[in-house]
Amino acid sequence: MVTSNVVLVSGEGERFTVDKKIAERSLLLKNYLNDMHDSNLQNNSDSESDSDSETNHKSKDNNNGDDDDEDDDEIVMPVPNVRSSVLQKVIEWAEHHRDSNFPDEDDDDSRKSAPVDSWDREFLKVDQEMLYEIILAANYLNIKPLLDAGCKVVAEMIRGRSPEEIRRTFNIVNDFTPEEEAAIRRENEWAEDR
C-alpha cells in the first residue's frame, strides 16, 4: 500500500492533510510512517488474501480527483502538543522546504555555523509567543533545521544586549537581590564587552 497523504491532528483536534513528503520533514513523523509501513508489510504477509480488507489507516471521502494507481488512504497522526495555528506554521515551513537539503544533522559545527536562511528569517518574524511555540513544536516533531533557525533567531535577539535589555525583551522578572546581582556581575566580568 502506498500512502500519499498524512493527516496531522492538532491539540485542538483540527485536521491538516499533508503530502507524505511534507510530513517526512519531521523525523518523528518519518519514523512513525516507517513503523506503520513496516507494520503493514508484516500484516500483509500474514494475511495476503485480505488485500481489500480494512486497515489501520483512515480514509477520507474527498479524493482530490487523483485516480492514480496509488491508494488514497491516509495515516492519521495526532500531534497533541501543538496548537493548530502553530502546526499550520510548521506545515508552511515544511512545504517551503519540501526539496531543501540541510547540513547533516550529526555535523553540529556546520549546523551551528550556517546562517539563518533569509526566507526562514522572514518566516520567523512572528510574535515571541508564536516563535517559542514554533521552536517547541520543531523540537517535539524533531525538525532540526527549523529548531536551529528558531534558536538562532532567539540568539540574535539576545546578542549584544545587557541583562536589563534582555529582561525587557523577554519579560523576565529580575528576582536577584542587588547583592546577588553584583556578585554575579563580578563573577562574569570576563564576558562583558568583548
Swiss-Prot record:
Subcellular location: Cytoplasm; Nucleus; Chromosome, Centromere, Kinetochore
SUBUNIT field: Component of the E3 ubiquitin ligase complexes SCF with HRT1, some cullins like CDC53, and some F-box proteins like MET30 CDC4 and SAF1. Interacts with CDC53 and MET30 to form the E3 ubiquitin ligase complex SCF(Met30) which also contains MET4. Forms complex SCF(Cdc4) together with CDC4 and CDC53. Component of the CBF3 complex, which is formed of CBF3A/CBF2, CBF3B/CEP3, CBF3C/CTF13 and CBF3D. Component of the RAVE complex composed of RAV1, RAV2 and SKP1/CBF3D. Interacts with RCY1, ROY1, CBF3D and SGT1.
GO BP, sorted A to Z: cellular response to methylmercury; exit from mitosis; G1/S transition of mitotic cell cycle; G2/M transition of mitotic cell cycle; kinetochore assembly; mitochondrial fusion; mitotic cell cycle; mitotic intra-S DNA damage checkpoint signaling
Biased composition (Basic and acidic residues): 54-63
Entry's family note: Belongs to the SKP1 family.
Start and end residues of each stretch annotated as Disordered: 38-79
Signal peptide segment: none
PANTHER family on file: SKP1 (PTHR11165)
SMART domains linked: Skp1
Keywords, ordered alphabetically: Centromere, Chromosome, Cytoplasm, DNA-binding, Kinetochore, Nucleus, Phosphoprotein, Ubl conjugation pathway
Sites bearing Phosphothreonine, chain numbering: 177
Compositional bias per record (Acidic residues), positions renumbered to this chain: 64-75
Region (Interaction with the F-box domain of F-box proteins): 135-194
GO-annotated cellular components: CBF3 complex; chromosome, telomeric region; cytoplasm; endomembrane system; kinetochore; nucleus; RAVE complex; SCF ubiquitin ligase complex
Protein name, UniProt field: Suppressor of kinetochore protein 1
